[in-house]
Amino acid sequence: MENQRRGILQGLNRSRTISTQTNNTTGQLNSTTTPTITGKSVFMA
């Protein structure tokens, strides 16, 4: 169970870094629809 949770957290961190990179370029557009990076990463995943 602990390994599964750790794997999920690693996956979230990985998608968060990807969404952060794309959020730097399209931050102005996404700020109106998805204000949080976490919400965007969940949406992208």
From Swiss-Prot:
Chain intervals with Polar residues compositional bias: 12-39
Region of interest (Disordered), ranges: 1-45
Name of the protein described by the UniProt record: Putative uncharacterized protein DDB_G0276421
